[in-house]
Amino acid sequence: MPNSRPRPRRGAGGGAGAAGRDRLVARSLQSAEHCLGDQDFGTAYAHYLLVLSLAPELKDDVKETFQYTLFKWAEELHALSRIQDLLGCYEQALELFPDDEVICNSMGEHLFRMGFRDEAAGYFHKAVKLNPDFNDAKENFYRVANWLVERWHFIMLNDTRRNMVYNAAIQKAVCLGSRTVLDIGTGTGILSMFAKKAGAQSVYACELSKTMYELACDVVAANKMENGIKLLHMKSLDIEIPKHIPERLSLVVTETVDAGVFGEGIVESLIHAWEHLLLQPKTKEENGNCGKYGKVIPAGAVIFGMAVECAEIRRHHRVGAKDIAGIHLPTNVKFQSPAYTSVDTEETVEPYTTEKMSGIPGGYLPLTECFQIMKVDFNNLQELKSLATKKPHSLNVPAIKEGVLDAIMVWFVLQLDDEYSLSTSPSEETCWEQAVYPVQALEDYCIQPGDRVTMEASCHDCYLRIQGISILHLEHEMEVMKGFTKSKDLLSLGNEAELCSALANLQTSRPEALEQTCMLEPTEIALLNNIPYHEGFKTAMRKVLSSLAPELLWQPMDTHCQYMEMNSGSGQSDAAPSTADPFYVLDVSEGFSLLPILAGTLGHVKPYSSVEKDQHCIALDLIAEANHFPKETLEFWLRHIEDEAAVLQRPKSDKLWSIIILDVIEPSGLIQQELMEKAAISRCLLQSGGKIFPQYVLMFGMLVESQTLVEESAVQGTEHTLGLNIAPFINQFQVPIRVCLDLSSLPCVPLSQPVELLRLDLMTPYLNTSNKEVKVRVCRSGRVTAVPFWFHLCLDDEVRLDTSGEASHWKQAAVVLDNPIQVQAGEELVLSVEHHKSNVSIAVKP
């Protein structure tokens, strides 16, 4: 805390008034310091406000102490949920210090924490403008920029063909008389500007995102169209005539379609537009000026599908192994990903995931021909209204190849009018991804030519839903459903004895054997399928536990058998009597983790899991029971602590941990926030000889040339946007690091061998350096556009987990250069690597 007391300066006017003011200022300063000493931050803050209102000339003297007081008081207000008071304090502070980047950044952090991302971005952006070298503000701005301006904006604006086709369709409509235009979900305003350039008389554009609305205002003004385009910061559903728009319009243009067509609400917005904003549609019999009628671009969409085999989708949506590093997964625990929805579900979550299938690691195998799922006419109000209420229709598609049914892949042709169209097929060079409906909950996923894939398609809750996916197999001249559940199979049993026998086999007569569905994120399912990860942890944990009790070294025998032996009878082995203290193992990795159960198989261990969700706890208990754990061996750590924010603490007041497992890399490929701080606390909680896993982390990187990364990170000039000046404005939201990459399938040319860039040591922090320069030899001539990076998690010196490996559940990341560097084979470049508060930056020096 700053501890300097400024001396009040006498006002130039002198006299009794000035003297009284000085005395009040001095007393208030003294009171503020006393309150700070007593940690009464609210009262101290009030005293500083009084001082600065009476003596603004003291701003520079008390600035640091005032900041400290403000931040401490704001944390207390946040803990008390006094949000209005908190925001009021920051507004007062910014009136006093309007150009203080530290206060701006702190205000942004509070707003972001409260969910006001648009507003937070404004404060982070202002802080960076005030001080471009302020790392905390830069990192905060990069983080929020990914939320506010999603990366697909850059990809779509760089898609020249998409821009040309939309421009041509809009030009044609305007030339045919559609002179009053509304652009729904305008984004940067590009479609509105196409309409204005085509000669539209009145153009309106609406955008809900505050950030994108303000960006569109800047873009439209820069292109000198601010007088011809009226921008509205609102949803199209809230637009009223004549309040916002004077009269009904002849044309609506929109691109509010996602990979599954309907996911961005296009059906709802077009129903509202036809009912409240557009002129009546032109009938087939009517001719004449199009300006008298209403019309929508795009005019409609045709949706296609294909059944595919794809190992990458499979490993993210189905748990393939029945045994993971010696842990048996019982059949009564069913894992599912959020993309799974049953036929009778009423959930409104997005029922699909999205992938760029042309670049998915390992590729995919078509199992059926392409088939049409549905067709929709955006210029037909009755058809739009019936979409959400129409009953699901069945599809029955013959298989043409042998394989494993992993997903239904969906794409569409967007028919802008009767002449112009865009396809999102994986065989097209397009900015769109495909919608993927993973197949789950079948008894058998194998398919042969002649089998048939059946499913139901609907537009329930304005999402395209593909449900009830099954395989019909032609066998003995009968179609037998392979996807029958066990309960349906029971109905075919011939007599009561068989029924009883089947029930016994299914263990449905025992209440504790009831099935538990466990919903996991795709990365969590991929983690369960990552066998080297679990085997690596098992090996490393065994080494540590053996070193802590050498007299308990295991005999060379099967681990599972030994574990069964040591836990039979009294539940303890001869080598580990019940009076001995167990080894305490804490797993604080995020999400669902089997590591505590793995630890429990290694001897006299008390493992603690930090899973939060009830269904995850139940699933782990069932797995522990199936693996013959003594009751209450596995504990759930969050049930034992009062403050969930303080997860890292002793197992008991007089005990320490033998192993603490930390989550060090996010699934996106970045270092976890506050990693080194967590490691510092963890080191204080370890017994002598105890370890943090991983013990250290190595970061690797390489030089590459990748036009894909360039175009996904920033808009490239005006050529792609057909002469419109958009790039400088949206590129303010570009971030230097691209996350969630698959280096194995990224279109790129390696220009160097991988090199070690950084070491983060969690056990011996004095080995760490925050800055490092690394020389990299160029092995191939080209343009360096990016530096992809990944990590090796070193559980010890022998056991390493590679986040770029084939089985990895982690993605990778890359630093994308602002300006590519031309290099020749044999040259050396220097990479300047900086690690600051769990954020890594890489600069390339020629």
Swiss-Prot record:
Its protein name is: Protein arginine N-methyltransferase 9
What protein family is recorded? Answer: Belongs to the class I-like SAM-binding methyltransferase superfamily. Protein arginine N-methyltransferase family.
Q: Which residues form the SAM-dependent MTase PRMT-type domain?
A: 137-466, 530-846
Explain the purpose of this protein: Arginine methyltransferase that can both catalyze the formation of omega-N monomethylarginine (MMA) and symmetrical dimethylarginine (sDMA). Specifically mediates the symmetrical dimethylation of SF3B2. Involved in the regulation of alternative splicing of pre-mRNA.
- The cysteines joined by S-S bonds are none
Instruction: Provide the gene name from the record.
Output: Prmt9
UniProt superkingdom: Eukaryota
Q: How does it assemble?
A: Found in a complex with PRMT9, SF3B2 and SF3B4. Interacts with SF3B2.
* TPR-type repeats, residues: 25-58, 67-100, 101-134
Regions that span the bilayer: none
Q: Which reaction does it catalyse?
A: L-arginyl-[protein] + 2 S-adenosyl-L-methionine = N(omega),N(omega)'-dimethyl-L-arginyl-[protein] + 2 S-adenosyl-L-homocysteine + 2 H(+)
Q: Which PROSITE patterns match?
A: SAM_MT_PRMT, TPR, TPR_REGION
Keyword annotations for this protein, in alphabetical order, are:
Cytoplasm, Methyltransferase, Repeat, S-adenosyl-L-methionine, TPR repeat, Transferase
CDD domains tied to this protein: AdoMet_MTases (cd02440)
Keyword check for Nucleotide-binding: no
Pull one GO CC term from this UniProt entry.
cytoplasm
Citing just one GO molecular function, the answer is: protein-arginine omega-N symmetric methyltransferase activity
Localisation:
Cytoplasm
